[in-house]
Amino acid sequence: MDVKETILNIIEELFMEDVSEMMDEDLFDAGVLDSMGTVELIVELESRFNITVPVSEFGREDWNTANKIISGVVELMHA
């Protein structure tokens, strides 16, 4: 399973939403993510990918779409 597929599955598991057709849609505006959901997502991403998401790098505008989340995780995996 690749990073993209894993992240889409995590989002679906946590929020009961299939976002595969809305990769560039703002997940906050769409009602998929909120502040508590963001914390849950970060914890799960850190656990599954063995990464640390620094609070200083987690801005809503930087992680508000599925594509941005995927890019952020890939970047942290190669840091």
Swiss-Prot record:
Pfam families in the cross-refs: PP-binding
GO cellular component, one term: cytoplasm
Record's comment on post-translational modification: 4'-phosphopantetheine is transferred from CoA to a specific serine of apo-DCP.
Subcellular location: Cytoplasm
The species this protein was found in: Streptococcus suis (strain 05ZYH33)
Protein function: Carrier protein involved in the D-alanylation of lipoteichoic acid (LTA). The loading of thioester-linked D-alanine onto DltC is catalyzed by D-alanine--D-alanyl carrier protein ligase DltA. The DltC-carried D-alanyl group is further transferred to cell membrane phosphatidylglycerol (PG) by forming an ester bond, probably catalyzed by DltD. D-alanylation of LTA plays an important role in modulating the properties of the cell wall in Gram-positive bacteria, influencing the net charge of the cell wall.
Transmembrane segments: none
Entry keyword set: Cell wall biogenesis/degradation, Cytoplasm, Phosphopantetheine, Phosphoprotein
Modified residue annotations for O-(pantetheine 4'-phosphoryl)serine: S35
Domain of life: Bacteria
InterPro entries cross-referenced by the UniProt entry: ACP-like_sf, DltC, PP-bd_ACP
Domain Carrier: 1-77
Pathway(s) where this gene product acts: Cell wall biogenesis; lipoteichoic acid biosynthesis
GO terms, biological process: cell wall organization; lipoteichoic acid biosynthetic process
Name listed for the protein in its UniProt record: D-alanyl carrier protein
GO terms of molecular function: D-alanyl carrier activity
NCBIfam families documented for this protein: dltC, PRK05087.1
Signal peptide (residue range): none
